[in-house]
């Protein structure tokens, strides 16, 4: 529209630009469903047909509630291409997500950008090859949300996988029934022993291997510290491991540099190169240190001094 107007008057260019801005303002992403899954954890179905049409398991979106809102990266928990909906799971960790938790059906997001990141590498593999593999997924806490669409995709393609879900206590176990419906075997563990068994996801994996289970691949998603210890164990057991990294993100396109990671001898950006990486190559200690630095003004100043304009110096409160 604007290119056609370039041969016309300046007034035409201006009017076309105003129309585009107006159209952007009226396109809102309506929340069709909002429910509380657990303490400080909420699920929402959002009307976003374009994202639903193109997304794949493993990808994420960046949402913004209004003009003054933060840009918040959220993993896609599920999608329905026919209905044109995306399911997201939100955990309250700061002011923006606390505000988001009060949204209800009928409300809308101003921005809902995606799909971002690379799809899970598993969905690009030959189905018959996947059927011959023994795969285990380990989800820690909110990591159950991004694990679910991958396991669901595998189930829909005739691939049975084992799933280990861990949480601090029974009340923080989410999507249990949904996961039961798609997992070959589901193992649940809680830190305090309030549900099924006591222990970490790594304890369950150790026991399964000790019982004679053999795994060709492990996919671990959850807090960085959890993924670190899963990778330490799987390296010892000789199990190749994929992790989904969730560092601080701002633009989701690799421009801000906030999500940089050291993977082997290379610097990667989780938003464009990931979020999945070889867990045995990720420098978790550096990633956790960097994430912690973003949470203080002094830390952000240090990162700006070290990295110049290759990171978002004003970040740190996105979640």
Spans of features found by a protein language model:
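Short Fe-S-cluster ligation motifs
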Residues: 269-273, 277-319
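Ferredoxin-reductase
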Residues: 29-107
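Short, Lys/Arg- and Gly-enriched loop/turn segments at beta-strand edges
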Residues: 69-76, 116-126, 271
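Single conserved hydrophobic/aromatic residue that forms the stacking wall/gate
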Residues: 1-15
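FNR/FR-type flavoprotein reductase catalytic core
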Residues: 98-250
């Amino acid at each position: 529209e604007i290119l056609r107007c370039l041969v016309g008057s300046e007034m035409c260019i201006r009017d076309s630009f105003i129309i585009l801005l107006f159209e952007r303002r009226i396109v809102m992403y309506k929340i069709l469903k909002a429910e509380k899954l657990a303490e400080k954890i909420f699920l929402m179905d959002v009307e976003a047909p374009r994202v639903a049409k193109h997304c794949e398991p493993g990808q994420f979106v960046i949402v913004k509630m209004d003009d003054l809102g933060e840009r918040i990266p959220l993993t896609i928990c599920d999608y329905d291409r026919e209905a044109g909906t995306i399911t997201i799971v939100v955990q309250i960790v700061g002011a923006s997500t606390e505000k988001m938790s009060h949204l209800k059906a009928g409300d809308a997001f101003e921005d809902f950008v995606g799909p971002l990141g690379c799809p899970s590498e598993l969905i690009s593999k030959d189905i018959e090859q996947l059927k011959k593999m023994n795969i285990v997924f380990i989800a820690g806490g909110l990591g159950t949300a991004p694990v679910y669409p991958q396991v669901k995709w595998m189930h829909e393609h005739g691939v049975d996988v084992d799933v280990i879900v861990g949480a601090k206590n029974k009340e923080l176990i989410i999507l249990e029934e949904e996961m039961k419906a798609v997992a070959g075997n589901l193992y649940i563990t809680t830190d305090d022993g309030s549900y099924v068994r006591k222990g970490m996801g790594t304890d369950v994996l150790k026991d399964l291997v000790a019982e004679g289970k053999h795994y060709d691949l492990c996919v671990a998603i959850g807090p960085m510290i959890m993924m670190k210890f899963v990778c330490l164990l799987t390296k010892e057991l000789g199990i190749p491991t994929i992790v989904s990294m969730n560092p601080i993100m701002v633009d989701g396109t690799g421009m801000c540099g906030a999500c940089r990671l050291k993977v082997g001898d290379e610097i990667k950006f989780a938003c464009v190169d990931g979020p999945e990486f070889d867990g045995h190559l990720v420098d978790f200690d550096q990633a956790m240190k960097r994430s912690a630095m973003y949470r203080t003004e002094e830390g952000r100043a240090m990162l700006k001094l070290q990295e110049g304009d290759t990171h978002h110096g004003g970040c740190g409160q996105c979640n």
